[in-house]
Amino acid sequence: MTKKDEKGSNLDIPVSRLAESYKEKVVPALMERFQYKNIMMVPKLTKISINIGVGEAASEPKLLETAMQELAQITGQKPQIRKARKAISNFKLREGQPIGCRVTLRKKYMYEFLDRFVTLAVPRIRDFRGLSNTSFDGRGNYTLGIREQIIFPEIDIDKVPRIQGMDISFVTTARTDEEAFALLSELGMPFKKKNN
């Protein structure tokens, strides 16, 4: 697939394998399953947000730096620093203090990450029996927690100072959890089998 720049010449922009699969296989399958009248009604993935919370960043600022480097390696984008919204004395937390980092992926970067996540990272999870199918929010979005960042092949296990987890949110245009479940399943997410 080619696109044109401002002058009108063609630019070769590679389309990810998963983006092509969405157009060729997922859309027709969802159209048939949910009986959509229009192709624009078919749900699609709009963004993937990856968040690493580093609560100990107040006492050890180096932990936040390593979390940001690891997140940049995993996603290929520079992470945003997340700051505390309000002070909580029990946690020794002050307002505006850095407590984590986040990256939001869209379009081709989102599909590339999802492809790597499903094919390379998920099979490396210890004692994996399928992703939870109860983590939908009621509006068609799915969030899961990863306990170890070392499941991603971009992370060198020998250079990791400490194991830390992350939250990954998949935001879709689906109106119901059933539609979102079908969409993500068609895109290759290995969910646990539903007990009906």
UniProtKB/Swiss-Prot annotation:
InterPro entries associated with the record: Ribosomal_uL5 (IPR002132), Ribosomal_uL5_bac-type (IPR020930), Ribosomal_uL5_C (IPR031309), Ribosomal_uL5_dom_sf (IPR022803), Ribosomal_uL5_N (IPR031310)
GO terms assigned for molecular function: rRNA binding; structural constituent of ribosome; tRNA binding
UniProt keyword RNA-binding, yes or no: yes
Keywords associated with the record: Ribonucleoprotein, Ribosomal protein, RNA-binding, rRNA-binding, tRNA-binding
Keyword hit for Mitochondrion: no
Pfam families assigned to the protein according to its UniProt record, in alphabetical order: Ribosomal_L5, Ribosomal_L5_C
Gene3D superfamilies associated with the record: 3.30.1440.10
GO cellular component terms, A-Z: ribonucleoprotein complex; ribosome
GO biological process: translation
Subunit annotation: Part of the 50S ribosomal subunit; part of the 5S rRNA/L5/L18/L25 subcomplex. Contacts the 5S rRNA and the P site tRNA. Forms a bridge to the 30S subunit in the 70S ribosome.
Record function comment: This is one of the proteins that bind and probably mediate the attachment of the 5S RNA into the large ribosomal subunit, where it forms part of the central protuberance. In the 70S ribosome it contacts protein S13 of the 30S subunit (bridge B1b), connecting the 2 subunits; this bridge is implicated in subunit movement. Contacts the P site tRNA; the 5S rRNA and some of its associated proteins might help stabilize positioning of ribosome-bound tRNAs.
Family recorded in the similarity comment: Belongs to the universal ribosomal protein uL5 family.
Protein name: Large ribosomal subunit protein uL5
Organism: Prosthecochloris aestuarii (strain DSM 271 / SK 413)
Recorded name of the encoding gene: rplE
